């Protein structure tokens, strides 16, 4: 697997469309889940930190795109609440010999958030969920890992929303 890249970066865009706010919320959720995994930070502290210091604010000279705060909270809280259900599903979807705990922390965060959204957020098209989390992964890992993210999330999309995904 690739070396972990530094995990900071502005959430920027020229427009404040709902899709951009949701994309920013997804990226912030992955960052928050990563922080919780690596630093052992608690959910309340992480939610408060991101909502007061990161989302829509200027940090170290970079303007972060406003994120849909309720969507951000739903993803982070949902992953934490459902993690004991999400992790075994991801372990099954991953290749044999690569359990979830063996992959990079950033990929765990991406996969957990994507799995949660695929299972629980039926208001978001499955293909959008897969595409968004593959794009997020691409910002931090090499192409091989983004391919793995795509394969795992597509497998889960077919499992949770087969009718929506259509034939293989």
Curated annotation (Swiss-Prot):
Keyword terms: RNA-binding, Transcription, Transcription antitermination, Transcription regulation
Keyword Transcription regulation: yes
GO biological process: DNA-templated transcription termination; transcription antitermination
SUPFAM superfamilies: NusB-like (SSF48013)
GO MF, one example: RNA binding
Statement: the UniProt record of this protein carries the keyword Transcription: yes
Gene Ontology CC annotations of this record: cytosol
Pfam families: NusB (PF01029)
Role, per record: Involved in transcription antitermination. Required for transcription of ribosomal RNA (rRNA) genes. Binds specifically to the boxA antiterminator sequence of the ribosomal RNA (rrn) operons.
HAMAP family: NusB (MF_00073)
Homology family: Belongs to the NusB family.
UniProt name for this protein: Transcription antitermination protein NusB
Organism per entry: Bradyrhizobium sp. (strain ORS 278)
